[in-house]
Amino acid sequence: MAHKKAGGSSRNGRDSESKRLGVKVYGGQAILAGGIIVRQRGTRMHPGENVGIGKDHTLFALTDGHVKFTTKGAGKKHMVNVVPAV
């Protein structure tokens, strides 16, 4: 018998590419206007003073300065602020 049975097929072997989410500039670090501070899915962190939000919920600096993370309210909402450079 010189025959070989067909091998079974597998439904595994795929994985999605990582999206590189998270904090890009930490508290106290300097940032330029337009610089990305946080990449996120949904508003885990909310924009504060001198911070804008993109259509994919990315937080970015509107002015040059230093990043400052704070919490606000009873639910402890995470806010991201940029303190302008003097």
UniProtKB/Swiss-Prot annotation:
Disulphides: none
UniProt GO molecular function: structural constituent of ribosome
Keyword Zinc: no
Keywords (A to Z) from UniProt: Ribonucleoprotein, Ribosomal protein
Stretches the record annotates as Disordered: 1-20
Record-linked Gene3D superfamilies: 2.40.50.100
Tree of life domain: Bacteria
Gene Ontology CC annotation, any one: cytosolic large ribosomal subunit
Entry-linked InterPro entries: Ribosomal_bL27 (IPR001684), Ribosomal_bL27_CS (IPR018261)
Pfam families: Ribosomal_L27
One GO process term, biological-process aspect: translation
PANTHER family attached to this UniProt entry: LARGE RIBOSOMAL SUBUNIT PROTEIN BL27M, RIBOSOMAL PROTEIN L27
Family that this chain belongs to: Belongs to the bacterial ribosomal protein bL27 family.
Name of the protein this chain belongs to: Large ribosomal subunit protein bL27
